[in-house]
Regions:
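Extreme N-terminal, non-catalytic leader segments
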Residues: 1-7
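Hydrophobic positions on the alpha1 helix immediately C-terminal to the Walker A/P-loop
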Residues: 22
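ATP-dependent small-molecule kinase phosphotransfer cores
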Residues: 35-125
Length: 148
């Protein structure tokens, strides 16, 4: 069986599900074992994308849901063109959130059109496909009570 030397791994999960802990622990393992890797997050990644992240997550900005989607996709476009394609098949690429989160939050959470989201995402990522998606689950009841 053919194994990719440098896979692209996406880490998905709702807030407080352990997603960030998982990606950080895996990063430590890779570093300890001297694997070449990069770790990025969405939104974020490039300097420009980190600025977009600040705008999107600022409580003082009440963004329209379409604006929110387009900013996330702008961040992804920057990541794909400036980080992912540059490092593809040269380093292991770890990504904290990607397309699945966009569908979950913007379609199922905000009610935006699924076909529009998928079409825009396909336009941005082109032929790029991640090799593996790791999903961190948590019981919703436990998630709700952790913030009470």
């Amino acid at each position: 069986m053919y194994k990719k030397k440098y896979p692209v791994i996406i880490f998905e999960g709702i807030e407080a599900s352990g997603k960030s802990t998982n990606i950080n622990n895996f990063s430590k393992f890779l570093k300890k074992n001297k694997y070449q890797f990069i770790k990025i997050r969405e939104p974020g990644g490039t300097k420009f994308s980190e600025k977009l992240r600040k705008i999107m997550l600022s409580k003082s900005n009440k963004l329209d849901k379409k604006t929110d989607l387009l900013l996330i996709l702008a961040s992804r476009s920057e990541n794909v063109s400036k980080i992912i394609y540059k490092n593809y098949q040269k380093k292991i690429i770890l990504i904290d959130r990607f397309s699945d989160s966009t569908i979950a939050y913007q379609h199922y959470g905000m009610g935006l059109n699924l076909n529009i989201i998928k079409n825009l995402n396909s336009y941005i990522i082109g032929k790029f496909k991640p090799d593996l998606t790791s999903v961190s689950y948590t019981h919703l009841r436990a998630h709700e009570t952790s913030y009470d």
